Amino acid sequence: MIRNPEIQFASADAIAAFQQERLREEIAYLYENSPYYRRMFDHCGARPGDIRTQEDLRRLPVTTKTDLQLHPQDFICVPRSRIIDYVTTSGTLGDPVTFALTEEDLDRLAYNEAESFTTAGCTPEDVLQLMTTIDRRFMAGLAYFLGARKLRCGVIRVGNGIPELQWDTIRRIGPTGCIVVPSFLTKLVAYAEEHGIDYRCSSLRRAICIGEALRDTAFGNNTLGAKITELWPELELFSTYASTEMQTSITECGHHCGGHVPADLILVELLDEQNNPVAEGEEGEVVITTLGVRGMPLLRFRTGDICIGYTERCACGRGTMRLSSVIGRKGQMIKFKGTTLYPPALYDILENIPGVSNYIIEVFTGSLGTDQIVLRIGSARRDEAFEKEIKDTFRSKVRVAPEVVFEPVEYIAKKQMPQMSRKQIKFVDLREQTK
């Protein structure tokens, strides 16, 4: 794999030429080593030499999650003896998919995360506290650890949860940054306030935030980002976007104007429902082609994530594409009473209602064949006035009011973290079961 972190600061023409060369190499590798993609090329009547630019990719079909689930072995490009690590996707939109990684792929992950941390302002002088799991077949936790080592930062592998242990570690070692699911920061603050910890004077100065959006499409803070910043203004938050399929992390810089796509690791297209490119500034599905992955590379993979792309050069000097936070998942789009909604918009509203301790959003198909939404709210308040307040808030924000059902906080907490899950569940889609 050719690594060129400086290419992101080059001219648009130089970036395009660099990526075209990497793309041609990737296409040749796929045709030679991937049973799935060789079959796809032959079926389309295409040859590797036909694909020379990103525009040429449109001649090829997209790869879907279903393709991965139906033909997992056909995507593997190396003999079993070269596979040294196995990970799985989280299974947000279906059965988890297993990915096989080679030594080169782990080196690539380390390089990517080291560059991501650098984009977020980290240096070898930093000590990073890893507040996420590194086990349970989770690629990202391992990638963060490898990337921090690559950058020669200190690393503290605390794992997820347990605020008491997190604060004890912060007190003992004095980390300067953390890798964390941002909503957990609110729990750290709550624990600190309950136990007299002066968290605003702690050693932490930056948080690399994973798994949840912090920004709106105008790059301002969403409700979660604003809440954390209000509670802990000394802590600078950096938004990231990544997935197991991408084997790449996209991270924002200190200007907080979208995540910078690493040009030497991935190609990104933003497509509409007909697989046509969307105009700049319009929402589109993120479709990725990995560069330099050896074990299970992907070509034109539909992530299901809806984002907005920007090509204007950032104030930091990088000229590669920038991506907004994920607006929603294509498979999770809800059409409720004539209004198109994505779960993150509903999360944003609920996170900002005082008295809502936790929640799960359920969507199902009603008797008339239309989408219906139930908000299961964990709260100490369970009166009609609070229900009306919640519904009125939704009407003012998104013009529609879902059904509200109050549940014990403990019940919702258990539903959010099933025994085999490594991700907190806030959205349950029952539409296939209730058609």
Predicted features along the sequence, with ranges:
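Phosphate- and divalent-cation-binding pockets in alpha/beta enzyme and binding domains
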Residues: 36, 40, 165, 187-188, ...
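Conserved AMP-binding/adenylate-forming
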Residues: 219-313
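AMP-binding/adenylate-forming catalytic core of the ANL superfamily
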Residues: 178, 292-400, 422
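Short, well-ordered beta-strand segments
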Residues: 127-130, 287, 376
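Active-site phosphate/ATP/adenylate-binding loop shared across adenylate-forming ligases
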Residues: 4-6, 63-232, 250-257, 406
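Nucleotide 5′-phosphate-binding alpha/beta core
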Residues: 1-88, 94-111, 115-119, 124, ...
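Anion (oxyanion) recognition and catalysis
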Residues: 31, 149, 262
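Generic structural signal for residues in well-ordered beta-strands
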Residues: 155, 237, 268, 359-361, ...
